[in-house]
UniProtKB/Swiss-Prot annotation:
<feature type="binding site">
    <location>
        <position position="173"/>
    </location>
    <ligand>
        <name>1D-myo-inositol 1,4-bisphosphate</name>
    </ligand>
</feature>
<dbReference type="GO" id="GO:0004441">
    <property type="term" value="F:inositol-1,4-bisphosphate 1-phosphatase activity"/>
</dbReference>
<keyword id="KW-0963">Cytoplasm</keyword>
<feature type="binding site">
    <location>
        <position position="195"/>
    </location>
    <ligand>
        <name>1D-myo-inositol 1,4-bisphosphate</name>
    </ligand>
</feature>
<feature type="binding site">
    <location>
        <position position="110"/>
    </location>
    <ligand>
        <name>1D-myo-inositol 1,4-bisphosphate</name>
    </ligand>
</feature>
<feature type="binding site">
    <location>
        <position position="223"/>
    </location>
    <ligand>
        <name>Mg(2+) 2</name>
    </ligand>
</feature>
<comment type="function">
    <text>Catalyzes the hydrolysis of the 1-position phosphate from inositol 1,4-bisphosphate. Is also able to convert 3'(2')-phosphoadenosine 5'-phosphate (PAP) to AMP but with less efficiency.</text>
</comment>
<keyword id="KW-0378">Hydrolase</keyword>
<feature type="binding site">
    <location>
        <position position="106"/>
    </location>
    <ligand>
        <name>Mg(2+) 1</name>
    </ligand>
</feature>
<feature type="binding site">
    <location>
        <position position="200"/>
    </location>
    <ligand>
        <name>1D-myo-inositol 1,4-bisphosphate</name>
    </ligand>
</feature>
<dbReference type="GO" id="GO:0005737">
    <property type="term" value="C:cytoplasm"/>
</dbReference>
<feature type="binding site">
    <location>
        <position position="109"/>
    </location>
    <ligand>
        <name>1D-myo-inositol 1,4-bisphosphate</name>
    </ligand>
</feature>
<feature type="binding site">
    <location>
        <position position="106"/>
    </location>
    <ligand>
        <name>Mg(2+) 2</name>
    </ligand>
</feature>
<feature type="binding site">
    <location>
        <position position="108"/>
    </location>
    <ligand>
        <name>Mg(2+) 1</name>
    </ligand>
</feature>
<feature type="binding site">
    <location>
        <position position="197"/>
    </location>
    <ligand>
        <name>1D-myo-inositol 1,4-bisphosphate</name>
    </ligand>
</feature>
<keyword id="KW-0479">Metal-binding</keyword>
<feature type="binding site">
    <location>
        <position position="111"/>
    </location>
    <ligand>
        <name>1D-myo-inositol 1,4-bisphosphate</name>
    </ligand>
</feature>
Length: 285
């Protein structure tokens, strides 16, 4: 099966938009459960994933979608939305093969932030690889007017950028503070704390931060791919902490975790890649 790039992108954007809207409008009491790895999951996560899967699978029944949660379709066809029709500037509307596509879905990134009402760290993340390479990234912030940011190859949607800080800004969670690792950083810096992998990477995309260093076997494919496509289209770097490309397996039968951690650098922070890699020489993952 084949489709045009523009049609495919519009289906994905519609799916993210609808899922994001469902999160922002959820009014029932949130029920928290715990997965085998100890992470939280709620009915809001599963509802969001059902919406995304239903919209995409209705159009492309055989497509390979890997979602964080263990649910798939669930929305009746007669309740599916009309697909949005955006144009993408001078981007070539090429024909793509569905069999060469893998979609990675995090229906609610930052679930623990969501349950603690830290809504600025909540995102919906949908990323796509084509023939094994990152191709499309779509990120929505449900509690910021369902703001959607996306990149298709090197085409980037409109992004609000913050004024650059005089210091280099590191972003991490308080739980996984990295201050002890970067004491010898060569220039003035500051550490800001934020939850959610997607929110940390989006902070770099919006110029609120410069470096995200995560030297743990914790982040998964669906946590990183969407924002990776956007950040790389801006000219930034996304890799593991040793400088290798992040891996995106084709099946949940393989580990979805990034076993060598995650490192993200803004365009202006790329010059610090050698320094960050030197830190990683002391860390065994």
């Amino acid at each position: 099966m084949q489709t045009s790039l523009f049609e495919f992108a519009n289906v994905l954007i519609t799916a993210v938009k609808e899922a994001s809207y469902s999160i922002s409008k959820f009014k029932e009491e949130v029920e928290i459960k715990y997965k085998s790895d100890g992470s939280e999951v709620t009915q809001v996560d599963t509802q969001s994933q059902q919406i995304i899967f239903s919209i995409i699978k209705n159009k492309y029944p055989t497509i390979n979608i890997i979602g964080e949660e263990d649910v798939e379709n669930g929305i009746p066809d007669n309740q599916l939305p009309t697909i949005t029709q955006l144009s993408f500037g001078s981007l070539e509307n090429k024909i793509i093969n569905i069999n060469d596509i893998i979609i990675y879905v995090d229906p609610l990134d930052g679930t623990d932030c969501y349950t603690h009402k830290q809504y600025d760290s909540v995102c919906v993340l949908v990323g796509v690889t084509y023939k094994g390479k990152p191709m499309i990234g779509i990120v929505s912030k449900p509690f910021y007017n369902n703001e959607i940011t996306f990149a298709i190859e090197n085409y980037i949607s409109s992004i609000s950028l913050q004024p650059l800080n005089d210091k280099i800004i590191f972003v991490c969670s308080k739980k996984n503070d990295i201050q002890h690792l970067i004491k010898s950083f060569p220039d003035p810096y500051e550490v800001k704390y934020k939850g959610g992998s997607g929110a940390k990477m989006m902070a770099i995309i919006h110029q609120e931060a410069d470096i995200y260093y995560h030297p743990l076997i914790q982040s998964c494919t669906w946590d990183t791919l969407a924002a990776q496509v956007i950040l790389e289209a801006q000219g930034g770097i996304v890799c593991d902490i040793y400088g290798n490309p992040l891996c995106y397996p084709s099946s949940k039968k393989e580990s979805m975790r990034h076993k060598k951690g995650v490192l993200c650098l803004s365009p202006r922070a790329k010059k610090y890649l050698p320094y960050m890699l030197s830190i990683s020489k002391t860390i065994l993952l």
